[in-house]
Amino acid sequence: MELTPRDKDKLLLFTAALLAERRKAKGLKLNYPEAVALISAEIMEGAREGRTVAELMSAGTEILAREDVMDGVADMVHEVQVEATFPDGTKLVTVHNPIV
């Protein structure tokens, strides 16, 4: 199977998000890469499901709370930008202050 660099990035992001979901389910606080991966993967899945950019920008702030991440992580993540594939093409989704 041949994967493009973009497909490899998506697969790596999915794997990191899956790990983050498992750790969160165990009650563990997420670190920076896990938090960003989880938010990014949720946005990409929402785009694939046909949700709008505006919906995803809003939903992106509801995925994680400060209690879900290690100390200082929420202050480090000012925005998350994801290039997601929508039914009508690829668009950039930016979520400002995603961890509240």
From Swiss-Prot:
One of the GO biological process terms: urea catabolic process
Pathway where this protein functions: Nitrogen metabolism; urea degradation; CO(2) and NH(3) from urea (urease route): step 1/1
One MF term in the entry's GO annotations: urease activity
Domain of life: Bacteria
Reactions catalysed, as given in the entry: urea + 2 H2O + H(+) = hydrogencarbonate + 2 NH4(+)
Compartments reported by the entry: Cytoplasm
E.C. number(s) listed in UniProt: 3.5.1.5
Keywords, in A-Z order: Cytoplasm, Hydrolase
GO annotation, cellular component aspect: cytoplasm
Main location per the UniProt record: cytoplasm
Cross-referenced Pfam families: Urease_gamma
Disulphide connectivity of cysteines: none
Quaternary assembly: Heterotrimer of UreA (gamma), UreB (beta) and UreC (alpha) subunits. Three heterotrimers associate to form the active enzyme.
NCBIfam families attached to this UniProt entry: PRK13241.1, urease_gam
Family: Belongs to the urease gamma subunit family.
Protein name: Urease subunit gamma
Organism: Marinobacter nauticus (strain ATCC 700491 / DSM 11845 / VT8) (Marinobacter aquaeolei)
Gene assigned in the entry: ureA
